[in-house]
Design a protein with these regions (language model features):
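Alpha-helical, largely C-terminal catalytic domains
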Residues: 1-208
Length: 208
């Protein structure tokens, strides 16, 4: 772990600031976690930090499609935090059952360690948001999860099938995984369905 510089700032709670800096420096590692999907231009794989930023932006852009009662500020914060656990747990490919089977355990252990780097009040707050996102029971969490599921679909369509083609994914597999989108946003769910239909016509799915 990278430790903060050994300097002292006057008029600041040094222990608290050190904990915050330690967390901030640790999350720099998110930039080196590569996801399976490519950038929309197909030039290289996306990393987790880019993914998290793009989803936070999407929450603002698509705010009008959020369910009633959703708090977009909370959704944005959720999306900034949601993949921090992958610093320890790594990226889990959505169409790899063997990876999925251990995902929850790996990510909970990562959340225990990483969020605990923060001062206690911030640790409780960030962990509660992450748990809420994972549980998907609130309008905020459902909308956040919908955006998280839509983004790789867009990347795959714009890279001529992307991971769908590379890993031999079927239409049925994609349709099952993206049901979550409609749960969080009727409009985005409708768009996702139309995108699947078009991707199918273009031959982006395995027939196996």
């Amino acid at each position: 772990m990278t430790e903060p510089a050994p300097v002292f700032a006057g008029g600041v709670d040094h222990e608290r600031l050190t904990s915050q800096l330690r967390f901030f420096l640790e999350t720099d590692k998110l930039k080196r976690i590569l996801r399976r999907n490519m950038l929309v231009d197909g030039s290289r794989r996306e990393n987790d930090a880019e993914h998290s930023w793009h989803l936070a932006l999407a929450a603002r852009v698509f705010a009008e499609y959020a369910p009633e009662g959703a708090d977009i500020d909370r959704v944005v914060e959720m999306l900034v935090l949601h993949d921090i656990v992958e610093i320890d747990a790594g990226d889990t490919f959505i169409f790899a059952p063997e990876e999925q089977s251990t995902q929850a355990e790996r990510e909970r252990a990562a959340a225990d360690r990483i969020f605990a780097l923060l001062p206690e009040d911030q640790a409780r707050h960030t962990r509660a948001l992450w748990d809420e996102f994972e549980a998907r029971r609130t309008p905020d969490a459902r909308f956040a999860k919908a955006i998280d599921r839509l983004a790789p679909m867009l990347a795959n369509w714009h890279t001529e099938g992307g991971t769908w083609v590379r890993y031999g994914v079927t239409r049925a597999q994609v349709a099952e995984k993206v049901k979550i989108i409609a749960e969080g946003s009727e409009a985005l769910g409708s768009y996702a369905s139309a995108l699947i239909d078009d991707a199918d016509r273009r031959g982006y799915f395995s027939r196996g």
